[in-house]
Amino acid sequence: LTSVYGMAEQSNLALVSELIVQEPSMEERSREAFLEKFREQSGKPLIGFCVLGSIFSEGIDLTGNSLIGVLIVGTGLPQICNEREVIRAYFDRQQKKGYDYAYRYPGMNKVLQAAGRVIRTAEDVGTILLMDERFLERDNQSLLPEEWESYYAVNRNNCGQVLENFWNGLDNDKVAEAES
């Protein structure tokens, strides 16, 4: 998280956006102040950097324009540890997919929880960017919601344009809807 945040600070993002980062061991007051930044709607785009699977990945509701996108870096795989390896070995002995139960499923659960922060009501609109080639693997795609079957595989060269086209197309749809 620190290195990604550092790169953002050095990029053009810092010139056009406000950047905030989740701090380790945030107390309740700091967490509320962090979330309030999203609700303020200051006019300048806000980009928040959070740890996948942390306190901000579930149990928060930022509806409307408070949160219009999430960029998830990595598939959320847990660290290799004795507990995970025991789970893996158990399911492997059962002729089941030990790696999936120990690592893939918990990781993808974190991804889905974080992505679920974007669309909280029927009126919410937003983008979910999954930044890792592993999301294109069949085993990972099979764990994503059916509604996500329409997606774009982008890279750093065309990501901005695809997002711009999405939001411009959305605006055009609203105009056409209002005219009819």
Regions found by a protein language model. Give the residues of each.
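ASCE RecA-like P-loop NTPase motor cores
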Residues: 1-180
